[in-house]
Each structure stands twice: as C-alpha cells, then as structure tokens.
Regions:
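Solvent-exposed serine/threonine-rich low-complexity stretches and specific carbohydrate-binding patches
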Residues: 99-114
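Glycine-rich beta-solenoid repeat tracts in large extracellular/virion proteins
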Residues: 2-13, 30-37
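Surface beta-strand/loop "capping" patches
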Residues: 42-77
Length: 154
C-alpha cells in the first residue's frame, strides 16, 4: 500500500499534515499520496484546495554525489517561504515518483512574484552515485507535498 495517505472524506479534508524527517520506502504505492488518487500533478499558482492544500512538490534538477549538492526548483504560491526536504532511496516507486528512505537535509526556498523559487544546497548526509533523490515541500501552514519525481544521482 501507500506510505502515507491524506484524503478528503465526507466529514473533513486533511490539512496541515506536516510530514518531516521520516523514512518512507519499500511500499507498493506512493510514499505520500494527497487525495488517494496517485500522483497529484503540480498546478500553476498552487491555489487549489484538498488534502494538505494539494501542495505542489519540488523538482530535482541535479544531484551530485561527490559534492553532496542537490539543485532544483519549486513552483507554488507567489512570494512565500517554503521548506524543501531532500531524501535518497535505492529505488523509485513504479510511478517514478519518490519515496524517502534516508533524510539528507533541508533548505528554505522563497518563491518570487511568479511563484517560482530555485535551490542549490550541500546536504548534510552523503549519497551514492545512482541513488534516487527526491524532495518534498512544506508550506508555512505545515502542509507537506507528495514526493517529487526521482532524479538519479551522478
């Protein structure tokens, strides 16, 4: 099954579900699923509603093992400060979106007026070449995104 599933019922919508520093891996579904419907694709401006406000996930653009540097970007609400947490796993889910076996570190990302923020961070923990690197984004209210798509470390 899924690692963590946040969803809307007839009684309530799960919000402010902060998921931090966890080890979520080796399950048969997504590591984090907002809405109980598989990967929730990112949307421009991230103004939708639903479990954890359907917080957009970051995208990893590179992960370099020798320097422990991970780069990426987040497209979400404009002029907002987020925490991006970075993880590694030996494999990805069948969806090619991540899980998070090993917590590597976090970085603050502030989006611009268009809702885009970039990051480049030397994480605290090392990771091997070929490791699958993923990330989550946490908004100021504590809403955590699903894991990003996997990026193989070089």
């Amino acid at each position: 099954g899924k690692g963590i599933n946040l969803y809307t019922s007839i009684y309530t919508t799960a919000i402010r579900g902060t998921i931090r520093h966890n080890s979520i891996y080796s399950n048969t579904g997504l590591g984090i699923d907002l809405g109980n419907n598989g990967v929730t694709l990112n949307d421009t401006g991230d103004v939708d509603t639903g479990p954890n406000s359907l917080q957009n996930f970051p995208s990893i653009t590179s992960a370099t093992s020798s320097t422990r540097v991970v780069t990426g970007r987040l497209s979400s609400r404009a002029n907002t400060k987020y925490t991006v947490e970075i993880y590694s796993s030996p494999t990805c889910d069948p969806s090619h979106f991540g899980e998070g076996k090993v917590y590597l570190g976090a970085v603050s990302v502030t989006t611009n007026g268009s809702g885009v923020g970039s990051f480049s961070v030397a994480v605290l923990s090392s990771f091997a070449v070929g490791s699958k690197i993923t990330a989550t984004a946490i908004d100021p209210a504590g809403n955590t995104s699903e894991f990003s798509a996997c990026r193989a470390a070089n």
